[in-house]
Amino acid sequence: MALDTANIIEQLKGASILELNDLVHAIEEEFGVTAAAPVAAAGAAGGAEEAKSSFDVELTSAGTEKVKVIKIVKEATGASLLDAKKTVDGAPVVLKEGLSEDEANELKAKLEEVGATVTLK
């Protein structure tokens, strides 16, 4: 069975965030790997720690205002209402990856304002 990379990429483009998240977990389980970014080795003793340049926003809990959280997730991710609901129901889940510190803090503040619990990674 020959794999056509372009075909696979096209199929992935049409997948929802929830479907892509499920795919990543299935690959991790099947191959015994992790999708986490590799951690840089510690520098020389006494060296200044490098500032983090990109952040992932993880929804830990929707809290009591679930409808408001779904609305914010829908707006932030561009997902359909149903996909946004599935994403919120699947918490804890990473909502957005690779955001700048300002973007990540802005999304975190919006979600926390309506009672959600959010962590930045």
Curated annotation (Swiss-Prot):
Asked if the Swiss-Prot or TrEMBL record annotates the protein with the keyword Ribonucleoprotein, the reply is yes
Decide whether keyword DNA damage is in the record. no
Query: What keywords tag this UniProt record?
Result: Ribonucleoprotein, Ribosomal protein
What does the entry give for GO biological process? translation
The record's annotation in Pfam families points to: Ribosomal_L12 (PF00542), Ribosomal_L12_N (PF16320)
Q: Which Gene3D superfamilies match?
A: 3.30.1390.10, Single helix bin
InterPro entries noted in UniProt: Ribosomal_bL12, Ribosomal_bL12_C, Ribosomal_bL12_C/ClpS-like, Ribosomal_bL12_oligo, Ribosomal_bL12_oligo_N_sf
Any one of the GO CC terms: cytosolic large ribosomal subunit
Q: Which domain of life is it from?
A: Bacteria
Query: Annotated Gene Ontology MF terms?
Result: mRNA binding; structural constituent of ribosome
Q: What does this protein do?
A: Forms part of the ribosomal stalk which helps the ribosome interact with GTP-bound translation factors. Is thus essential for accurate translation.
Q: Would you tell me the protein name for this molecule?
A: Large ribosomal subunit protein bL12
Organism of derivation: Lactobacillus delbrueckii subsp. bulgaricus (strain ATCC 11842 / DSM 20081 / BCRC 10696 / JCM 1002 / NBRC 13953 / NCIMB 11778 / NCTC 12712 / WDCM 00102 / Lb 14)
